[in-house]
Regions:
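Juxtamembrane regions of bacterial inner-membrane/periplasmic proteins
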Residues: 1-255
Length: 255
């Protein structure tokens, strides 16, 4: 038995009072059989298709048979932590959902009157890209919630493998998919060679891969307004012990 509880209460005169509750509950729940799509397929090598405006543009395997695939332990620890702290710092500790992050993102979107922040966890992003079509409607959101819940609560794919898949399929620029292509495209390096500044820059692109050029001034250097983002991520890296406090304090948006 599965039950889904959802509550959204908005006072547009006081957006900070917005209430958002979303919870999937189970009682004596067991999976008898899966449908045509295996929800555990990310655990092994599988074929991934990237889409642009609903049209497939790239298809490639996520595993050792792909020359662009990079195992998690071959990716710079600084890059791994930079992306995680930017996208979903609690990824290894939650079960796929962060209601507070969704609430804050919704409040911000309503304040600026546009879709500016998604609030999706890494698991949610994976489910959207690997399992679902590109339709944006309530039925698809329910599908997404159910698949996320099943993968996380039934432990169909390990967190380490999910993060490995994520870093190998995420878009880092127009038709630039995965960390190996991104490292070569921007810095002519392997993923294991990325510096702190380069790693933070790549993390900053993920929310806007098609518009990465907006981060640069006319002279080719990063814009000054990137400094706050660099400082924030560097501080989190230092808190995680990935870099030193001295390096975090001296970080600059300079690549």
């Amino acid at each position: 038995e599965l039950a889904y509880h959802f509550l959204l209460d908005i006072d547009f005169a006081q957006l900070d009072s917005l209430k958002l509750e979303s919870e999937l509950k189970e009682k004596d729940f067991h999976i008898i059989s899966y449908g045509a799509t295996s929800l555990s397929k990310m655990s092994d090598e599988f074929i991934y298709t990237a889409y642009e405006n609903g049209v497939p543009v790239r298809t490639f395997p996520i595993g050792p048979s792909c020359k662009h695939f990079t195992p998690l332990d071959s990716i710079s620890p600084i890059l791994r932590m930079s992306v995680m702290q930017s996208e979903d710092g609690a990824f290894f500790y939650h079960r796929g959902f962060l209601p507070d992050a969704l609430r804050e993102a919704l409040i911000y979107d309503l304040q600026v009157k546009r879709f500016a922040r998604g609030g999706s966890t890494i698991t949610m992003q994976l489910v959207k890209n690997v399992f679902l079509n590109r339709n944006k409607n309530f039925a698809r959101k329910l599908e997404e919630a159910l698949i996320v819940w099943l993968i996380e609560n039934e432990r169909l794919t390990s967190k380490e493998r999910m993060y490995e898949v994520y870093l190998n399929i995420v878009e880092w620029g127009p038709l630039v998919y995965g960390i190996q292509e991104a490292s070569a495209y921007y810095f002519k390096k392997r993923p294991s060679q990325l510096t702190t500044e380069e790693s933070i820059f790549l993390a900053s692109i993920i929310p806007k891969p098609k518009h990465f050029r907006s981060s640069f001034a006319e002279g080719g250097q990063l814009k000054e307004n990137m400094e706050g983002y660099y400082k924030l991520i560097a501080k989190r890296l230092a808190q995680q012990g990935v870099i030193s406090e001295i390096e975090a304090d001296s970080i600059r948006p300079d690549i």
